[in-house]
Amino acid sequence: MSTTHSASRITSRTATRSIRRSSVHPAAHPMPHPSKPAHASAFAATQPPLLRALRGEWSQLRFDAAGFYILLVTAMIAVAWSAASSNLVIRYGGEEAAPSARAAISGVFQFAMYGLFIWIARYLLREERTGFAKLKLLSLPNRFAIWVAKWVWLTIIAIASMMVMAVLSTAVTLGSLALTDQPWQRFVGASAAEYLKLGVMITIIAVGTVAFGVAVAIFTNNLSSALTMLFMWVLVIEGMLNGADESTRILYSLLPFKNGTRVFENPPMEWFMWNPTVSVGYFLVVTIGLAALAIALNKSKMTRDE
């Protein structure tokens, strides 16, 4: 019996010592993974808000499959339209037809804008609809930096997407004409300067389109309302007015997208109150100004709410 009591005392003493040791010396924390150093989060927290927002938005855009498919479908429509319209011009245009390098990318200017509107409005407002925007503010409580980061990345991707559409449209158009024994050489630019000018036109349209989309998305804060307003403005409001009518010529000259596409579409000079260079500047000032105003008002509203 004494042996049993001695063994139980030894066991209880051993357990008591182990408990005391564990309380005095707590368990060591697990080492961080080599691919994620311990100072990474601290370094990210000390970065400027805009830089953190740019990194976060880029991570989202890279894995936005739905946005990629929207741009892909837009590119397919633009390329198909460019090739089809160029073939029709060369076949049935007769002697009056004057094909050029612009005709080979006509689909980009006809349809890319609408695809970008859908892509922009969806990307900007899906977080508002799902409530993810409020969750994002917990890690980066700077709504102004988030909106600016979105605007920057959308502009860069829009320019790159439209450039790719233009290259594909030119390649498919020339290839389809060559396969049907049509004079494809008439759709080739006369010089590198002509293609450089087209690249500048595409950049201007992309920048203005994104800025206008950002402004409307912020002002409406609703996906269906934003898309309705964007398409109504371009297709109905700007589509209804004609610069040939002297009674509406002043109003026609004030339409932003009519000014933005003026250099490409090359309408009569008398339709506008100023020259094409002023039209380009007017288009960029109006669209970028609207986007900047929308972001500034959104920031002030958020400050009042706080």
Predicted regions: what is each one?
Residues 4, 10, 14-37, 282-306:
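Junction motif at the cytosolic side of a transmembrane helix
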Residues 28-73:
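Aromatic- and glycine-rich beta-strand/loop motifs that create alpha-glucan
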Residues 38-46, 67, 71-123, 147-220, ...:
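Secretory targeting signals
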Residues 60, 125, 136-138, 213, ...:
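Helix-capping/transition residues at the boundaries of transmembrane alpha-helices
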Residues 66, 142-144, 222-226:
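Membrane-helix interface segments
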Residues 71, 134, 147, 227-228:
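Hydrophobic/aromatic positions within or immediately flanking transmembrane alpha-helices
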Residues 120-139, 144:
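Transmembrane helix boundary and interhelical loop/hinge segments in multi-pass membrane proteins
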Residues 220-255:
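Transmembrane helix segments
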